[in-house]
């Protein structure tokens, strides 16, 4: 076999050694290439020899394994700088011909070296070529560098460590720096080196006093980015033509005692600019003072928007120093004194040229569009510090308009225009946007905008229509704030499909049109069919936006839509409330204006909390009482049936959640009333409780003196405000009522007093649990017509012979409850949705039922925050009573009762109309070593509990693992394998088949029915184990180690492969010798153009032969003898 050598492969060492045996050749070549690729280093080195420190000596270079010297022809400080940096001794002390020490021997590798100073290695500099020179070793160069450990710097006579005369310690002696050519770049290096921040100023002429000793530096050349002053270019240590009268000094930011303030302005962000320097305040001259300078000053003062740069015309005159003159900022500086300026205190000004600024912190800046039909179209109007102005169209273009639209969150500009005003109307304050590039996020970020009493030629006001411009209206309604929804986009009005408009979107629409809250949304062209455009977009409002144009939109997903599906909305303003029929403005019948019509409010849900908010809104103090029997008259028209859910802390009725109970009639004469404390809010007294007669607490009210406290009622433990154990407030504490003689007439009075309709059931024997504290009333005997329980006959306050096991309760007609009915006893968070109202259970219709509404139901039931609607079981065929349909909850309500719906009316409905819900499961694994192992715990009835291991097997475990997304079940653990839990044992005798989607689908005993202890808690181990708790990922190895490991693996694999090939070839030769030489071609090996990089190797098997392949030209391959013969010829 022959190994052919071909050189010329870029980036590789030449492989020229010939090998005989095939296997040894391949292994050697691969190993050499892998090692070369892994090391990838240079064969040149640099050192200093015969010096007194590691950073000084004769310069020697190692080339081709041989050390040699460098000739001093052309040798300068730039070359010395390269050597010092390369050796990690970046400070140049001096360059020298190394004649004061022994000369070098052997090669002189470099001559005529010419460096720029920024090279990373000496051999990167230009030179004659390796070994080319006309020198002797008497011309060998040397250097003296420093790593900085033997150099020090300090500032003297400045009063602190960050200001003063510059002094440097070199070779054990302190010396100064000459001020020749010293500037702010030099000062910046000094301040940075000393950790004193940026340079504020520099000085010469021994401003901080004359030093003594050597003058170490003169004519320094710094760029400002050097890490130390001695790294700047210089003539050499101690070389100068100065005396100490020229000693340089600096003042750094950390030692400058600098401050900035505004004086004599009308706001905290305006006024004359003053700077404190060296303990004294002074002004800034307005020479060259412009908007860039003002922008830096405003930013520094925490008022980031510069409105005007005030000069001599407007700024008041200061006194004392004029510290700065000819300030010239770029706009990006963090402080005014970082801008270019004359030396501190040098100026050519008087105080009538003092500079000032008018800035803003953003709180007094506003941008808006007016008169365009929506917030995203119209005339551009700005308000700056309470002064309103327009934008002049003289410099108005699409770029400026784009910035306006962007700032308002209205997309991009579709078109610009202008509004022409007469000269009489043109006394506006104008804003000129002179130089927006379109990329700004705010018009205040545009450069060189001008504001104030400027003249706008032709009196044109800029206008814009933005891409998000959507102007809504309601059309076809009988009253204002109701009708078909139409939206104007661009110049075109169009309708919205009823599948593309949610309750949240309707809420935003009502708010934008100043129509209060949404009452209902009606599909099917309820307000008549529109014509023309139907917008093919779905509004995706969250509900808290102020305008429809702020809501995201998405393309419609359900195909085409016709005008027969135009959406309509009915809004209502609950915020207009009044009291009518009383002797004072602070008492009377409660009337609410809804849909433009005033009407009395039904008192079936009116309570003291609602009354408190109403009195507060009307500035009538607090609610003293809510009398029944319509003492202020019934009013005209049918009372509104809306229910307010005030907590008593709101400032306005419009802040309270509202339930619209639809069109069912209010009981005759049940009109809400209130007596507020009015001007006597500070003189309210508790009702007289000294008498044993409950009637005494009412006498004050009937005599016209409002009282609070005794006789207040509440219902406890009933699941709602209109059912529960009765508790009455007296003498500062709550107590119960005994059930002796307790009947439906007594219960009627309680329900009426609480605004809960009529009594359905009068309960006794502590039906709603035993109370605590006093038992205030016994033998209550009402005739059913009293307005308050305290007006009924009884034994008197506190006179009783009862115990709390006799506490009375009530269920009123307005009590509402919620449940899910399922055939499975283990399912409490899934089933048919039912509500309890007016004493009877009924189902809820599924029309318009959304995921948000389902979430409210699940949360109200204490299940989870999410759920889904499921089909009704096919075996359910009987009709049942339904209470309500079209329930559509927005985001926010805590109960179903706060969601708009169709009117509440009991009717028969088929199972296909009913709502069936499954609330999202809550299951977890505890105490496991991973997220997919541990004790099984389930959430039920508001608490976590465990599962008993009776009948627990791998099928049950499989369902749990699947439910948690943890793959296959590996083990069904028993006997508290992961420790004993606490709390309830919710499930027992679980018997899954293994294919169920959740544990709740498996047969089991009823919830909480168990004969187990926690020592029998069930557990699981699943296959898809999540990252172990507390695990830490190991840090990655270095690339060199990784490459080395890769090389070893490849090499081992290659050796094994090639040994196999060799054995196979030997067997083939034996076969050839037995059948004749011409049966098989001889195999030869030849090298191609280059060795391979280790990361270019790719081994694959093709037609039974192993071939090495890379991303470059193949390094070698297997060829037949015939191919080798053609190659050799």
UniProtKB/Swiss-Prot annotation:
Pfam families to which the protein is assigned, alphabetical: SRCR (PF00530)
BP-aspect Gene Ontology terms: acute-phase response
UniProtKB keywords: Acute phase, Cell membrane, Disulfide bond, Glycoprotein, Inflammatory response, Membrane, Phosphoprotein, Repeat, Secreted, Signal, Transmembrane, Transmembrane helix
GO cellular-component term (any): external side of plasma membrane
Short sequence motif named Internalization signal, residue ranges: 1085-1088
Cytoplasmic side: 1061-1129
List of glycosylated residues: 100, 118, 134, 225, 314, 439, 544, 679, 688, 761, 931, 995
Record carries keyword Secreted: yes
Signal peptide bounds: 1-40
Ranges annotated as spanning the membrane: 1040-1060
Domain SRCR: 46-146, 153-253, 260-360, 367-467, 472-572, 577-677, 713-813, 818-920, 923-1023
Keyword Plastid attributed: no
Site entry (Cleavage), positions: 263-264, 275-276, 327-328, 354-355
Compartment(s) of residence: Cell membrane
S-S bonds: 71-135, 84-145, 115-125, 178-242, 191-252, 222-232, 285-349, 298-359, 329-339, 392-456, 405-466, 436-446, 497-561, 510-571, 541-551, 602-666, 615-676, 646-656, 738-802, 751-812, 782-792, 858-919, 889-899, 948-1012, 961-1022, 992-1002
Topology class, membrane: Single-pass type I membrane protein
Membrane-side (Extracellular) residue stretches: 41-1039
Major localisation: membrane
InterPro entries xrefs: SRCR, SRCR-like_dom_sf
Subunit-level organization: Interacts with CSNK2B.
PANTHER family according to UniProt: SRCR DOMAIN-CONTAINING PROTEIN (PTHR48071:SF15)
Function: Involved in clearance and endocytosis of hemoglobin/haptoglobin complexes by macrophages and may thereby protect tissues from free hemoglobin-mediated oxidative damage. May play a role in the uptake and recycling of iron, via endocytosis of hemoglobin/haptoglobin and subsequent breakdown of heme. Binds hemoglobin/haptoglobin complexes in a calcium-dependent and pH-dependent manner. Induces a cascade of intracellular signals that involves tyrosine kinase-dependent calcium mobilization, inositol triphosphate production and secretion of IL6 and CSF1. After shedding, the soluble form (sCD163) may play an anti-inflammatory role.
Protein name: Scavenger receptor cysteine-rich type 1 protein M130
Organism this protein belongs to: Bos taurus (Bovine)
């Amino acid at each position: 076999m022959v190994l052919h050598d071909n050189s010329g492969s870029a980036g590789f060492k030449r492989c020229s050694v010939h090998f005989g045996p095939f296997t040894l050749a391949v292994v050697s070549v691969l190993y050499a290439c892998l090692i070369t690729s892994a090391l990838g280093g240079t064969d040149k080195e640099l050192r200093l020899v015969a010096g007194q420190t590691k950073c000084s000596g004769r310069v020697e270079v190692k080339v081709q394994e041989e050390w040699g010297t460098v000739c001093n022809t052309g040798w300068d400080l730039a070359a010395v700088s390269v050597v010092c940096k390369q050796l990690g001794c970046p400070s140049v002390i001096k360059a020298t011909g190394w004649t004061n020490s022994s000369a070098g021997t052997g090669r002189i590798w470099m001559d005529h070296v010419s460096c720029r100073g920024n090279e990373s290695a000496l051999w990167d500099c230009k030179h004659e070529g390796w070994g080319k020179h006309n020198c002797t070793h008497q011309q060998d160069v040397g250097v003296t560098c420093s790593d900085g450990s033997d150099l020090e710097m300090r500032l003297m006579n400045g009063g602190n460590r960050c200001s003063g005369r510059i002094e440097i310690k070199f070779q054990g002696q302190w010396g100064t720096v000459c001020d020749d050519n010293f500037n702010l770049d030099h000062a910046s290096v000094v301040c940075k080196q000393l950790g004193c921040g940026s340079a504020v100023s520099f000085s010469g002429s021994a401003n901080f006093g004359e030093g003594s000793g050597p003058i170490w530096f003169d004519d320094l050349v710094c760029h400002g980015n050097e890490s130390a002053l001695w790294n700047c270019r210089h003539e050499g240590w101690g070389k100068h033509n100065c005396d100490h009268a020229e000693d340089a000094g600096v003042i750094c930011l950390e030692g400058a005692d600098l401050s900035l303030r505004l004086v004599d302005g009308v706001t905290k962000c305006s006024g004359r600019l003053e700077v404190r320097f060296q303990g004294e305040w002074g002004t800034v001259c307005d020479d060259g003072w412009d908007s860039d300078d003002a922008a830096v000053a405003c930013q520094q003062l925490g008022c980031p928007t510069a409105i005007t740069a005030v000069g001599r015309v407007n700024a008041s005159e200061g006194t004392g120093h004029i510290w700065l003159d000819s300030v010239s900022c770029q706009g990006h500086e963090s402080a005014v004194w970082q801008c270019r300026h004359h030396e501190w205190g040098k100026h050519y000004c008087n105080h009538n040229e003092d500079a000032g600024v008018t800035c803003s912190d953003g709180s007094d800046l506003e941008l808006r569009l007016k008169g365009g039909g929506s917030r995203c179209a119209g005339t551009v109007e700005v308000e700056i510090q309470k002064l309103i102005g327009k934008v002049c169209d003289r410099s108005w273009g699409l770029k400026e308009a784009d910035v306006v639209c962007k700032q308002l969150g209205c997309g991009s500009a579709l078109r610009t225009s202008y509004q022409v005003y007469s000269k009489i109307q043109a006394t506006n304050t104008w804003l000129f946007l002179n130089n927006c590039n379109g990329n700004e996020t705010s018009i205040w970020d545009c450069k060189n905008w001008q504001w104030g009493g400027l003249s706008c030629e032709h009196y044109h006001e800029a206008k814009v229509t933005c891409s998000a411009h959507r102007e809504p209206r309601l059309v076809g309604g009988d009253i204002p704030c109701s009708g078909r929804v139409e939206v104007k986009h661009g110049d075109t009005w169009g309708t919205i499909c009823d599948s593309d408009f949610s309750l949240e979107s309707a809420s935003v629409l009502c708010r934008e049109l100043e129509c209060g809250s949404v009452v209902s949304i009606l599909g099917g062209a309820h307000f008549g069919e529109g014509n023309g455009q139907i917008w093919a977009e779905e509004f995706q409002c969250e509900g808290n936006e102020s305008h429809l144009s702020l809501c995201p939109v998405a393309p419609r997903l359900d195909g085409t839509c016709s005008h027969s599906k135009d959406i309509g909305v009915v809004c209502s303003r609950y915020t207009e409330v009044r009291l009518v029929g009383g002797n004072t403005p602070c008492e009377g019948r409660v009337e609410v204006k809804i849909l433009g019509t005033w009407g009395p409010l039904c008192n079936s849900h009116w309570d003291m909390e609602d009354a408190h908010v109403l009195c507060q809104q009307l500035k009538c103090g607090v609610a003293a009482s809510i009398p029944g029997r319509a003492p202020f008259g019934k009013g005209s028209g049918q009372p509104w049936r809306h229910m307010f859910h005030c907590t008593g802390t709101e400032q306005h009725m419009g802040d309270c959640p509202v339930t619209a109970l639809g069109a069912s009639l209010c009981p005759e004469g049940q009109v809400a009333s209130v007596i507020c404390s009015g001007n006597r809010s500070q003189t309210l007294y508790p009702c007289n409780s000294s008498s044993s007669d409950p009637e005494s607490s009412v006498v004050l009210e009937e005599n016209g003196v409002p009282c609070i406290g005794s006789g207040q009622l509440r219902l406890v433990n009933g699941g709602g405000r209109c059912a529960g154990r009765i508790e009455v407030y007296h003498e500062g504490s709550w107590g119960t009522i005994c059930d002796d003689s307790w009947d439906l007439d007594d219960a009627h009075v309680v329900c009426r007093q609480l605004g809960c309709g009529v009594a359905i059931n009068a309960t006794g024997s502590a039906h709603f649990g035993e109370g605590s504290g006093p038992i205030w009333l016994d033998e209550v005997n009402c005739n059913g017509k009293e307005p308050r329980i305290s007006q009924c006959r009884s034994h008197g306050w506190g006179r009783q012979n009862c115990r709390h096991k006799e506490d009375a309760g009530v269920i009123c007609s307005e009590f509402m409850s919620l449940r899910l009915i399922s055939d499975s006893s283990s399912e409490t968070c899934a089933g048919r949705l039912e509500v309890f109202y007016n004493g009877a259970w009924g189902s809820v219709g599924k029309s318009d039922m959304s995921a948000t509404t389902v979430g409210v139901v699940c949360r109200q039931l204490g299940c989870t925050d999410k759920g889904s609607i499921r089909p009704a079981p096919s075996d359910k065929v009987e009709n049942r009573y339904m209470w309500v349909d079209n329930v559509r909850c927005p985001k926010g309500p805590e109960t179903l009762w706060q969601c708009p719906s169709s009117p509440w009316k009991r009717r028969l409905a088929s199972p296909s109309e009913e709502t069936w819900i499954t609330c999202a499961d809550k299951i977890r694994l505890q105490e496991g070593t991973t997220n997919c192992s541990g004790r099984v715990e389930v959430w039920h009835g508001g608490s976590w509990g465990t599962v008993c291991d009776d009948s627990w097997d791998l099928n049950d475990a499989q369902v749990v693992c699947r439910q948690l997304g943890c793959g296959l079940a590996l083990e069904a653990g028993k006997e508290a394998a992961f420790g004993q839990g606490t709390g309830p044992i919710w499930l027992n005798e679980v018997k899954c088949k293994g294919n169920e989607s959740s544990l709740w689908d498996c047969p089991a005993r009823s919830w909480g029915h168990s004969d187990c202890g926690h020592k029998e808690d069930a557990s699981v181990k699943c296959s898809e184990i999540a990252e172990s708790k507390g695990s830490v990922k190991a840090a990655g190895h270095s690339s060199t180690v990784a490459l080395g490991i890769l090389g070893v693996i490849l090499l081992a694999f290659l050796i094994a492969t090639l040994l196999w090939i060799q054995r196979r070839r030997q067997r083939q030769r034996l076969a050839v010798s037995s059948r004749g030489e011409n049966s098989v071609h001889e195999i030869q090996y030849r090298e191609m153009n280059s060795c391979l990089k280790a990361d270019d190797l790719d081994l694959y098997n093709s037609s039974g032969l192993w071939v090495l392949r890379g991303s470059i030209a193949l390094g070698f391959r297997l060829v037949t003898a015939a191919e080798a013969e053609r190659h050799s010829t």
